[in-house]
C-alpha cells in the first residue's frame, strides 16, 4: 500500500512540475511580411503567443492535429495565444499575406506524424516554396537533437 501511495505521490509531483514548467514562445509579426520565428519547436502544454508588432497581419491555421480544438483564425492586428495540447505539426499563415509566403510551423512534442498531409496542402507557388524550406529547417533541428 505504501508503494502505491508513493507512486501516486510521485506521479502527482511530476505532473504538477510539468504544468509549472510549460513555456511560452512569443512570435512577432515583422515589417517584412514574415513571422519573427518561422519554425517553433515546443512541448505539449506550451503556449505560443503572436504579438501584433506590425499592422496588417494575423494567424490562420491551415493544418494540424485536432484543429477543431483551436481558434482557427485571429483578427487582423490582434494579440493571439494558443496552448498546444496535441502533438504534431501545425501550419499557419497570415490571411492577407499567405500567398506571398507568410507561413509558420509549430512542431509540438517532436512529433511529425501528420507531416505528409501538410506537404499535400495546395498553396501558391511562393508559399509552397516557403513551406519546403520550413520543413527542411524543422527536420534538420530534429535530426540534430
Where is each model-derived feature located?
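Positively charged n-region of N-terminal signal peptides that target proteins for export
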Residues: 1-5
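Extracytoplasmic copper-binding redox domains, predominantly the cupredoxin/blue-copper superfamily
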Residues: 19-145
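Bacterial N-terminal signal peptides
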Residues: 6-15
